[in-house]
Amino acid sequence: MNFENLLIEVGTEELPPKSLRKLAESFLANFTEELTKAELSFDSAVWHASPRRLAICINQLALAQADKVVEKRGPAIAQAFDADGNPTKAAQGWARGNGISVEQAERLKTDKGEWLLHQARVVGVETKSLIADMAQRSLDKLPIPKPMRWGSNTTQFIRPVHTVTMLLGSEVVEGELLGIKSDRVIRGHRFMGESSFELDHADNYLVALKEKGKVLADYQARKAIIKTDAEAAAAKIGGVADLEDDLLEEVTSLVEWPVVLTASFEEKFLDVPAEALVYTMKGDQKYFPVFDNAGQLLPNFIFVTNIESKDPQQIISGNEKVVRPRLADAEFFFETDKKESLEARLASLETVVFQKQLGTIKQRVERISALAGYIATSINANSEEAARAGLLSKSDLMTNMVMEFTDLQGTMGMHYARLNGETEAVAVALAEQYKPKFSGDTVPTAPISICVALAEKLDTLVGIFGIGQAPKGAADPFALRRAAIGVLRICLENNLPLDLVDLIAKAQELHGENLTNENVAEQVLEFFMGRFRAWYQDQGVSVDVILAVLARRPTAPADFESRIKAVAHFRTLEQASALAAANKRVSNILAKVEGELPAAIDDKLLVEEAEKALAAKLAELQPQLAPLFAAANYQEALALLASLRESVDTFFEDVMVMADDEALKNNRLALLSSLREQFLHAADISLLQ
């Protein structure tokens, strides 16, 4: 079989930078899936992407499908021939459909009978005749939320398409993609190199684009160049560039020929909080800020231009002129905001509605303040500081800086709190109240920050559930799932002695008559149980372990964590499987019992040696188990209970639980109930698989 390399490039107008990687990856994944479905072998596949092109390269692609033999079974011999041995109409019709005579058919014998058989040789289709349709289907499946039309064309795509190149080796693959006929014309850089050129061979794609078109189509190579050059440029001025990957990806997706340059701004702007300057540089201008080795912002930034200029200083000056007014705006906002304290801004919060049924932001911060102070008493934090931080937690929403740069909420509150003479703990709590903001984000660890972050999230959760607006399906407009996971993570990672039932009840009390949902407490608790499951599944904990703990509905996150660890460890023990099965059996037996069981085991009614042994073993363990469960030492308790395996196995082998004698039966049921109760102090291990 022969092989060739395939190139498919779609040349477009500038593609959305934040979608570029996903589009290219999806294009490649869709096309390789098509190749697999078509049974076309290939060695490897890669994608390339730049602002004006999506491309895929398939290496060592088979030039045709392999020939194959397809077995087509006909009627059974009994139905294929009549009593005289002549072919029936069924046999003749089947043979005719396969282009043969009945006499040419083979026989297939199995242990179930004998059938007519035709082994048809199917010649593989040439790859080049399949490529265009496969590529079009691959493009049709791209994740494009809002496709657009252009010109008089009815074709839709994420951006207007100008060129399509499909080369199998040196041969142009005939066909159209998105209404554009395939040829070998490739468009180069918009301002440098050849505006377009003909590509002679698929293998030369990257080299020709680089040398003729002044385009680095290899996305990863382009990203690596930007990163390396930016690091070198920062080091040259004694700093370190902030090369956050999301911004690095976006910049990589904005340029086809990256040139890294260094610029500066006036040092006076460094009096403005660094976060505001960084937000402006990164968010608005796509610049990389530069910090010194101590983490202090330098009056420099690194940017990437898409052209190799003969006068780079002119480009540098241009970018400095562009960023200066933005930094000046930040400076003005900061200086203006400093004239009014966070406390003085509390009155203005009365004019802003948090949610129609839940009142104003002023009412919200009063609730957060009270709840933060309440939480502080449970974790030995300063309740006055916690209440103060809660009260000031939303004042920065009324500042010019946050109104202009909304992502700086909390952060600017911290800076203004410091300027207002608030304690450092209060100031930091304002910045950390929204943490964790995303998966993988850190959680607050300072006591006052913990109190405010928990109060802020619980107020939202209980309030929104309390007015009947719980998340439905994928919709979660108030980010309640994130808030609930945040509460759990803060409690778990700080090992806090807090109970969700208590926290929910206090938050509900503070909302007062605002809440119309009578079942709010139970619904919020159930929501937390769902978040427990999601959180631990993401951590790789087995679902059956999670369900075993959830069955007991522990409402203190730290306690939940202890149970999870204990059950996960128990599951690794040799005795676990047998004891889980025994617990399941006990659970099923007890579920069928009608009426109440004896409160205690009557030793006089223990007649079989096996039940005596089990009762004795349980009695021996109970004094040891009680303090372990009281201390939430579930792992050691379950390890002790694992020693019951032999006694339990022997009991079920030798003892008839449902004895005819009612007293014996009830006593044995009481024994099993006592056994199960010990395990249930930790979890329902009958749910372990």
Swiss-Prot record:
Which GO molecular function entries does the Swiss-Prot or TrEMBL record give? arginine-tRNA ligase activity; ATP binding; glycine-tRNA ligase activity
GO biological process: what's one of them? glycyl-tRNA aminoacylation
The record, for SMART domains, names:
DALR_1 (SM00836)
Catalytic activity annotation? tRNA(Gly) + glycine + ATP = glycyl-tRNA(Gly) + AMP + diphosphate
Q: What GO cellular component entries does it have?
A: cytosol
Give the matching InterPro entries.
DALR_anticod-bd, Gly-tRNA-synth_bsu, Gly-tRNA-synth_heterodimer
Keyword annotations of the record? Aminoacyl-tRNA synthetase, ATP-binding, Cytoplasm, Ligase, Nucleotide-binding, Protein biosynthesis
E.C. code: 6.1.1.14
One Pfam family it belongs to: tRNA_synt_2f
Q: Does the entry feature the keyword Cell membrane, yes or no?
A: no
Q: What class of enzyme is it?
A: ligase
Task: Give the location in the cell.
Answer: Cytoplasm
Question: HAMAP family from the xrefs?
Answer: Gly_tRNA_synth_beta (MF_00255)
Oligomer status and interactors: Tetramer of two alpha and two beta subunits.
What family does the Swiss-Prot or TrEMBL record give for this protein?
Belongs to the class-II aminoacyl-tRNA synthetase family.
Stated name of the protein? Glycine--tRNA ligase beta subunit
Which species does the entry assign this protein to?
Shewanella halifaxensis (strain HAW-EB4)
Q: Which gene encodes it?
A: glyS
